[in-house]
Amino acid sequence: MKILVDENMPYATELFSRLGNVQAVPGRPIPSDALADADALMVRSVTKVNEALLAGTRIGFVGTATAGTDHVDDVWLQQQGIGFSAAPGCNAIAVVEYVFSALMLLAERDGFQLRDKTVGIIGVGNVGSRLDARLKALGVRTLLCDPPRAERGDAGEFWPLEKLVAEADVLTFHTPLNKSGPYNSLHLVDAELLAALPDNRILINACRGAVVDNAALLQALEKGKKLSTVLDVWEPEPELSLPLLARVDIGTAHIAGYTLEGKARGTTQVFEAFSRHLGQPQQIELASLLPVPEFSQIQLNGPLDEGKLKRLMHLVYDVRRDDAPLRKVAGQPGEFDRLRKHYQERREWSSLRVQCDDSASAELLHKLGFLTA
C-alpha cells in the first residue's frame, strides 16, 4: 500500500510507515505522478482536495492533519466512498497561545492590563472554548457568540454579535468559514460591522481569512479607524494585500496553530483514524515523539503579575518573531508558503515547567497550561 504524506507533516513518515510504503510530497501542488498509484493521501490546509485532484486515482482514504476542513470536498469524498478524517482540536492550544501572545504585546505597548478588558469570542468550539477558559482563569470578562451552540441549547451564556461589537474591547474570531446557509461566516466582519465598532478596540482573526472582508478592513483603516488589528489569516492566501499588511499591528503567515505539539497532534490523530479505517487500530503517546525543548524549567519568585506572565509566555513564544519575517518578504512570489514550510520550531506553554514559591501563582499557571512543580 502506498501512502502519500505532506512533506511538512512532522512524524508522518515515521508513523505511516507502520502501515505501508510512504512517499513525502509537496502539499502545493501535489505531483500528479505520485497520485497515480497511491492508496491514501495525508494533507494539510494548503492542499485542495476535490474531484479535480483525485478523479481517476485509486485513493481510498484522505486525512487532513488540520482542524479546519474547508480545503476538502468531503461531500464528494463521501459520494465516492473515500474514507476521510480530520484532526479537530489538534492546534487549538497553539491558536489560544498565539492570541495571548498578541494581546500581551498590545497590552504592554498601549499600557493596559488584560484583566481590565472584556474579550468577545466569536466561535466557541475547540479554540474558542479553550481561550474562554484561560481568559477566565486570568480574571478576564468574556462574552461568547456562537449561534449554532446557542440554538442547540448548549450550556453557557451566548450573545448576539451586536452585543459583542458594542461592549467588548477585543473581538477575536474562531469560526469555520461557511459560505452559505444559516451560519454563513463569509465576511462576517464587513463594512457595516467595522463602522459600528467603537474606536480603540482590538480585532483578531486567527481562523479563516475571508471571515473578515479584507478590502473593507483596509478601507476603514485608511480612513483613520482607530482599531488595533491582528491578522494571521488573509483574503486570499497565499497572496495578501500589502497595503493591509502595512496597516495591521500584527501580521503573520497563517501560523497561529503551528506549534510542534499542534502539528504532532494533527499527524497522530489522522494516523490513528487511518489505522482504525484499516482495521489495525494503534494509539500514539504524543510525548514519546516530542524532543526536549530549548527551555524546560524556570524558577518564579514571588507572586505572578501580568508583567511576569507576559515574560513567561514570550519566553516560550513571542508573536513578533513571526510578524517581522512576513513584512520582510510579503509580495515576493512563493514567500508566504516558504515561511510556513520552513517554520521555526515553536513549542507550547506546556513544554515549560515553572517552579513557584507562591501557591496561588502555581495554580494560575497550571490553569493557563504551564507545567508546575
UniProtKB/Swiss-Prot annotation:
Residues in coiled coil: none
Positions bound to NAD(+): 146, 175, 232, 257
EC identifiers of the protein: 1.1.1.290
Enzyme class name: oxidoreductase
GO cellular component, one term: cytosol
A GO MF label: 4-phosphoerythronate dehydrogenase activity
Keyword Signal: no
Function: Catalyzes the oxidation of erythronate-4-phosphate to 3-hydroxy-2-oxo-4-phosphonooxybutanoate.
Family named by the database record: Belongs to the D-isomer specific 2-hydroxyacid dehydrogenase family. PdxB subfamily.
Record's subunit section: Homodimer.
Name assigned to this protein: Erythronate-4-phosphate dehydrogenase
Organism taxonomic ancestry: Bacteria, Pseudomonadati, Pseudomonadota, Gammaproteobacteria, Enterobacterales
